[in-house]
Amino acid sequence: MKKEILSPMPGTVVDVLISKGDKVMEGQDAVVIDAMKMENRIQVPADGTVADVLVALKDKVAANQVMVVIE
């Protein structure tokens, strides 16, 4: 079953901590977003393998935008 990591708020990607093909665990940090002058660490929702990373460093993201797909 696929799981998506969504941006909880609009902001700018300041770090991408995982790559396509990585094995990840629930709770692991995946992406760091700068929003309202605060860095927000977005975590992996479930164990799995990264199927796709849809954002890159300095990308602007919208609220609820899909950033990563986990299989």
Regions found by a protein language model. Give the residues of each.
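Short beta-strand-turn/beta-hairpin segments enriched in glycine/proline and small hydrophobics
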Residues: 1-10, 32-45, 70
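A structural signal for short beta-strand/turn segments enriched in small hydrophobics and glycine
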Residues: 21-30, 35, 58-67
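C-terminal structural segments of small proteins and small subunits
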Residues: 43, 52-71
